[in-house]
Amino acid sequence: MSALGAPAPYLHHPTDSHSGRVSFLGSQPSAEVTAVAQLLKDLDRSTFRKLLKLVVGALHGKDCREAVQHLGASANLSEERLAVLLAGTHTLLQQALRLPPASLKPDAFQDELQELGIPQDMIGDLASLAFGSQRPLLDSVAQQQGSSLPRVSNFRWRVDVAISTSAQSRSLQPSVLMQLKLTDGSAHRFEVPIAKFQELRYSVALVLKEMAELERKCERKLQD
């Protein structure tokens, strides 16, 4: 059996048809979250709190490599288990913090963690970070980190047909040439077949549709 154990059961979808609840974990938890839920069952609370401190430090952009090594040695955790614990806890908090407190209620947050099988005392520690006094500071750090990333300033594309090429299989095969310009001044050019471009259009349209549906559900939830 793997050291990570079997995946924990997950009992609801992004929106529970019975409760109208919006899941902060999405349609199903990521592999990192599922794995950490299994390992937390065998972790003592003292070690978990030290782990949380490291994760919060990482969210603030601190270099925690030495502290991670010290925790692994003092808690007798293998590199594999420690990596899973850190990645899963980091992902869990990030997913909770990306939603405003008005959209994610403490009770719903704790219910989802209970369904994953996370121990109750650890759920309390996670909830205190997601909804406690440190939340405004974590939100501020996340905003600063997000604003430092370049954004798309311009997007251009055109259809190109190669009439003559060294690769005969590409002869007369249309493709789409795209160019992205970012706010940091960099430009990226790439070429994709028409079929892949259509897949991209469909995927973007689907994501936008799901985002709009989620926003409407959150608005209805707040109005109720």
Swiss-Prot record:
This protein's GO CC annotations: cytoplasm; nucleus
Subcellular localization: Nucleus; Cytoplasm
Pfam family of the protein (one): COMM_HN
Coiled-coil region: none
Keywords in alphabetical order: Acetylation, Cytoplasm, Nucleus, Transcription, Transcription regulation, Ubl conjugation pathway
Modified residues (N-acetylserine): 2
Annotated region described as Disordered, given as residue ranges: 1-24
InterPro entries (alphabetical): COMM (IPR017920), COMMD5 (IPR037357)
Family under the similarity heading: Belongs to the COMM domain-containing protein 5 family.
Quaternary assembly: Component of the commander complex consisting of the CCC subcomplex and the retriever subcomplex. Component of the CCC (COMMD/CCDC22/CCDC93) subcomplex consisting of COMMD1, COMMD2, COMMD3, COMMD4, COMMD5, COMMD6, COMMD7, COMMD8, COMMD9, COMMD10, CCDC22 and CCDC93; within the complex forms a heterodimer with COMMD10. Interacts (via COMM domain) with COMMD1 (via COMM domain). Interacts with RELA, RELB, NFKB1/p105. Interacts with CCDC22, CCDC93, SCNN1B, CUL2, CUL3, CUL4A, CUL4B, CUL7.
Protein name: COMM domain-containing protein 5
Native source organism of the sequence: Mus musculus
Gene that this sequence comes from: Commd5
